[in-house]
Amino acid sequence: MEDADFMTEIFNGADIVYVMETLGAGSFFDQNLDVVAAITRIGEVYKQAIQRSGVKRVVHLSSVGAHMDNGSGLLAFHHNLENILNELPKDVSIKFMRPVGFYTNLFAFIPMIKTQGAIVSSYGGDEKKPWVSPLDIAAVIAEEIEKPFEGRKIRYIASDEVSSNEMAAILGEAIGKPDLKWLVIPDEQILKGMIASGMNPQTAKGMVDINTSQRGTELYKDYNRNKPVLGNVKLSDFAKEFAKAFDK
């Protein structure tokens, strides 16, 4: 994804390209890596490859929070990527897909539940937030690929809206721990734990800032103005998958 010549060759002759960004395993623990800058550079490569190859239809996997120019932590690279792709000529039609938080991110809580008997984060409470299944993301992208392309379009993708406390109850019931709680601790405590685990301090701060943004109103402001029809995979459905992973 970092080689413009290679990506141009891949894109040549394509009717539609679907682009997303990722870094290698262990990137968050690379002490010399600026994650936001590295992924932003991938966006520049995509832009060059799209221009050189002559592709006119693009689907880009972005994220909730991409409308924010600051205050979103590591999600800032999604804002940067959308801006970069929006620099393409107007005859290039782009669909920006903005999913919300992935259910699959919840797998990271399994070791914590096993050792501490609770989900611990720096956000939580009874306010409902949107979550999404990768299956619903795939379904929406497949749908958008089949639809006409014209100009620039943003579409949010979500499967369910639940509060952190509701989530703890649903997941707890699924794993046989009906008293499972979602506990909230200070950002500073989360940050210290991430750094102690070996994470790049800048990256850790970016992760914590995502949590901080979830406690405010700005992260979901544009989502709430443009709410999508919710997908088919509810948290109760994902809880079955979570329970299987928990039992391994």
How should each PLM-predicted stretch be described?
Residues 2, 132, 162, 230-233:
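Residue-level signal for the nucleotide or nucleotide-sugar donor/cofactor binding architecture
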Residues 174, 187-248:
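A hydrophobic C-terminal alpha-helical subdomain
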Residues 38-42, 77, 230, 234:
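Soluble or luminal CAZymes and related metallo-dependent hydrolases
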Residues 8, 47, 134-142, 232-243:
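Short, amphipathic alpha-helical "lid/cap" segments that border enzyme active or binding sites
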Residues 1-52:
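NAD(P)H-binding glycine-rich loop region in Rossmannoid oxidoreductase-like domains
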Residues 24-32, 36, 51-57, 64-181, ...:
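Oxidoreductase cofactor-interface core, primarily capturing Rossmann-like NAD(P)-dependent enzymes
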